[in-house]
UniProtKB/Swiss-Prot annotation:
Swiss-Prot/TrEMBL Kelch repeat ranges: 54-102, 105-156, 162-210, 214-263, 264-313, 328-351
Gene name of this polypeptide: rabepk
Protein name per Swiss-Prot or TrEMBL: Rab9 effector protein with kelch motifs
Keywords: Kelch repeat, Repeat
Source taxon at top rank: Eukaryota
Function: Rab9 effector required for endosome to trans-Golgi network (TGN) transport.
Keyword set includes Repeat: yes
Organism whose genome encodes this protein: Danio rerio (Zebrafish)
Length: 351
């Protein structure tokens, strides 16, 4: 097993190294297809410089079934917590998002359960009534929702709008639907606006990530084919464009994950024709250039169907009362192609 060092609370991580986070308390079991989201502390906690926020892990699955529970890493106490939230319909390979108008909320769409795909939307509001029991509410949507599908992302939201393109039907098959679906979290309405340009072919296991007002789609698979292409959708003009990328082009890959930082997209892991990978690539949106990132020290095991989020990590500065913030990529769980499923927490600095 690789010997990846543990990053302690407020310790400064080095660039080009992987670390393990080991929160205390009862960690989740091994899982695939969950989502990870960082939620900042509510403003009233921030006046004293406290309030590091929390990472919320929702749903997922392993051979024992799909999950209706959520786990929290409380970054102030560096502890796992299993909150008393009820009402989530069990799902994995779903999508999670936080609308701009409700920063203290978490919404989910789609995903799969044992025998069926979901197309429902549920929302959990942290602003509801103090620290008491909270409930996932099923959102009564208007308009025509997409068909049930897997759609594994936590970064497909621009403002208050979630953008849904393609997704998984069953097994290695993508949905046949080539329509763009847009969910407005304020009006709770689904629409299917017309687009122009060249859309991607239908696929599942693709990365969908927002950078400014653009949505980027990378990779994915359909049948036996692994895609290596990248497309952008301008969410204002609704025009698709194929990206003419340069640099270290990633191979065809599916079930990878992404985070965005400073107009750069970072992808890690996924399944390629050669099996699960542990490579990380950076895409500079302004230069349209890919770079394969090089690391020192041990690397995490290759994995797919994990989830990642951007983690603002507070670092205690010597001779100072103030903390510096470094932005980390946080990775949880996933599996390799030999059937080993993970429940580890990994981080690396994004530069």
């Amino acid at each position: 097993m690789e010997l990846i060092p543990v990053l302690e609370p407020e310790q400064k991580p080095q660039n080009r190294h992987w670390y393990v986070l080991e929160p205390t308390g009862a960690a989740p079991g091994v899982s695939v297809g969950h989502t990870c989201s960082f939620l900042p502390a509510a403003h009233h906690h921030d006046e004293d410089g406290g309030g590091k926020g929390k990472i919320v892990i929702v749903g997922g699955a392993n051979p024992s079934g799909s999950f209706a529970d959520s786990y929290i890493i409380n970054l102030d106490t560096h502890q796992w917590d299993l909150p008393d939230w009820e009402g989530l319909q069990a799902r994995y390979e779903h999508c999670s998002f936080t609308p701009e108008s409700e920063p203290q909320s978490l919404w989910v769409f789609g995903g799969a359960e044992k025998s069926t795909n979901r197309n429902c939307v549920q929302a959990l509001r942290f602003s509801d009534g103090g620290e008491g029991r909270r409930f996932w509410q099923s959102v009564q949507v208007t308009g025509v929702p997409p068909s049930g599908r897997t759609y594994h992302t936590n970064s497909a939201c621009v403002g208050n709008r979630l953008f849904v393109f393609s997704g998984g039907e069953a097994g290695s098959s993508a949905v046949t639907d080539a329509q763009l679906h847009v969910f407005d979290a304020v009006s709770v309405t689904w629409t299917q606006p017309d687009t122009t340009g060249t859309p991607p072919a239908q696929r599942h296991g693709h990365v969908i990530t927002a950078v400014g007002s653009d949505i980027y789609i990378h990779g994915g698979m359909s049948g036996e084919k692994f895609h290596s292409d990248m497309f952008t959708l301008n969410t204002e003009s609704l025009k698709w464009q194929k990206v003419k990328a340069k640099g270290d082009l990633p191979p065809g890959v599916a079930a990878h994950s992404s985070v965005t930082f400073n107009k750069n997209i970072f992808i890690f892991g996924g399944m390629t024709a050669d099996g699960a990978t542990n490579s990380m690539f950076k895409f500079q949106c302004d230069k349209q250039r890919w770079t394969l990132l090089k690391f020192e020290g041990d690397l995490p095991p290759g994995r797919l169907d994990h989830s990642m989020c951007l983690l603002p990590w507070r670092v205690k500065m010597e001779d100072s009362e103030h903390a510096d913030v470094q932005h980390l990529c946080f990775v949880f769980g996933g599996m390799d192609t030999q059937g080993v499923i993970f429940n580890d927490c990994l981080v690396t600095v994004l530069t």
